């Protein structure tokens, strides 16, 4: 036991003097540190998108959670694997230098980034919700408080304002609950329940001869399924391009390190990407998305539950805009890496021209002796 402790202490004492110089060398490696900045920014954007994509598909296109997750698995995950494979195959075949690899990664990634902006046009408007997105008279408004859920048509009903039990009126408007729709009677049971004599539907500014409502939110626009397919196809292409650029980018990381620094450098790179991107990005993405919530649910114990209704326009701009901002900033250190590598390449080429290889010098001497 004593021998083991001495051996362990000796290893520790021999490790620390070697570790500090390597760590110092890594922190003074400009390409390596810039690459870590790029990774943190790009991975933060990617992690935020993938974490909240199921929720985005639910809110924007009206898909269920299971359908949203299934769609992501079908459209996004396979092409990421294919992109990594072809990226590695491409780099193996063409045997590029570090500057060429960085150039390829930059332009491929930039093309995917520009294509990403086309997702802003895959829009699906939600059905109006009385007291949240429109007034009970049918006028649009953006400000929301619990008082806006009350109107003259339901003021005398003593409705609970924190309950989320939506019903769809015959006028195409969703109401937070049958009580807030002013419904006086119901027929049927379970999913087939129909609420009748709904005073708020009758008093709304929408033309409707009926004053009944059914369980659930009203359906979204007819073009929502088409827009969903457009969004998923664009997401598929962007995911493929993103993964295609990853392999040449990783080659830049590896080649920027000396052989004795690679194991430590790769480890610190992985640690930084998880500590500064993998952990915090879902937190601040979630906090920002929560600011777009219009109606919070209530737990059985009375506490605040999950968000039931979002302002989908603000949600869309935050969900798509924040990754665009992070990725856009990541191209600043990318440009600096290209400039540094280009300068190194020119410097090495000038040295070769000034000091030709030994074989070339020997051949020139032989040619001189033959003359």
Model-derived regions, located:
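An acidic-aromatic substrate-binding cleft motif
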Residues: 33
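Conserved, compact domain cores that house catalytic/ligand-binding motifs in diverse enzymes
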Residues: 272-273
